[in-house]
Curated annotation (Swiss-Prot):
Subcellular location: Cytoplasm
Upper lineage: Bacteria, Pseudomonadati, Spirochaetota, Spirochaetia, Spirochaetales
Any single GO CC term annotated in Swiss-Prot or TrEMBL for this entry: cytoplasm
PANTHER family registered for this protein in UniProt: ISOPENTENYL-DIPHOSPHATE DELTA-ISOMERASE
A biological process term (GO) from this entry: isoprenoid biosynthetic process
UniProt-recorded name of the protein: Isopentenyl-diphosphate delta-isomerase
Stored Gene3D superfamilies: Aldolase class I
Pfam family, one: FMN_dh
Organism: Borrelia garinii subsp. bavariensis (strain ATCC BAA-2496 / DSM 23469 / PBi) (Borreliella bavariensis)
Main function: Involved in the biosynthesis of isoprenoids. Catalyzes the 1,3-allylic rearrangement of the homoallylic substrate isopentenyl (IPP) to its allylic isomer, dimethylallyl diphosphate (DMAPP).
Amino acid sequence: MGIEPNILENKKRHIEICLNKNDVKGGCNFLKFIKLKHNALSDFNFSEISLKEEIFGYNINMPVFISSMTGGGKQGNDFNKSLVKIANYLKIPIGLGSFKLLFKYPEYIRDFSLKRYAYDIPLFANIGAVQIVEFGISRIAEMIKRLEVDAIVTHLNAGQELMNVNGDRNFKGIKESIAKLADFLSVPLIVKETGFGISPNDVKELLKLGVSYIDLAGSGGTNWVLVEGIRSNNLNVASCFSDWGIPSIFTLLGIDDSLKANVFASGGYETGMDIAKGIALGAKLIGVAAVVLRAFYNSGEDAVLSLFSDYEHVLKMSMFLSGSKSLSELRKNKYFLSSYLLAELGVFKQFYET
C-alpha cells in the first residue's frame, strides 16, 4: 500500500513554498543588532582555533546541526539521504523529518532508518508532541529503537497545526507525555519549537520535565503559519501571525548561564556570522534548515558543502577577530547589544520573566 497521494502532495508543496524565502520569513530574529567585540591584539596562530564540540558522545567538527525538515515520499527521502551523507562527511549532527507516517505505513521504515549513512555523527529522529499522546510512550519508544537513532526530537508546532484545516486541535496532555517519554527513553530527548520560539520560563519547565536539550527555534526564520496559509490559500488569516513569536536571542539573553549548555538556537540563522553570534550568546549548537534546503534544491550537494565551508571560514574569522581560540572562549562575554535591542529586551523581560 502506497502513501496517500494527498500526504505526499502536502509534503512536496511545503518544500516548494519554503524555497521562496521572502514569502515565509517570519519577523525579525534581531541578530543584526548584536555585535561581536573586536580584539586587535589576538596573539595566537589562526590555525590554533578549534570549532570542535562534543554532543551525545560524538566529537563534531563545528557547533552546527541540520535541523529536521521533511520525510516520506521519494523526494523527501532522497533529500534526507543526501543530507545525511553530507552531514556525516562534515561531521555535524542532523535531524530527520517526522516519522509519524510510519505508524500508518510501517513498511517505509527503511526510508527513515538512515543511521547506516550517519555512522560518525549524531542522528535525530523527530515526532510531534501531540503524537506522543496519540500513539503512546511504548509505541514511540519502540519506533525509536527500530530507527537506531542517537536522540529524538519532539516538536511543538501548534501554530502550524491550527492553521492547517486538517491539523491537530487537542494538545491536552503534552507536558505529561513529554515528561514520561523523557523518563522512559534510553536516548536523549530534545524538545523544539518550529519557528515561534520558547520563553525562558518554558525552558526552565521543560528541563524540569526531564528534557535533555531544548531547541529554541525562534521567530525570524521560516514561519509555518505562513507556509500553511500559502498552501491553503488563506493568507488573510496567516498574515496576522507574520511577526508572531519569540526570537531565540531573547531567550538566550533571558536565561541563566547555567542552563545554556542544554540549549540549541535556531530560527533564521543563515550565515557564519549569525552562527558566531548565537554561540557567543551561549548556545550549545546552532540549527540551520531552510538555508540548506534552498541551497540543495537550487544548486545541489556542492552548494550545501560550499555553504558549510563558508560557515567554517566566517566562524573562525569571527573567533580570531574577537580573540577566541575555542568556542568556550567565544561564549565569554564577547558581544555587545545595540540600544534598540536593549530596549526591546527590556520589554521582553518585563512580560516573559517572573
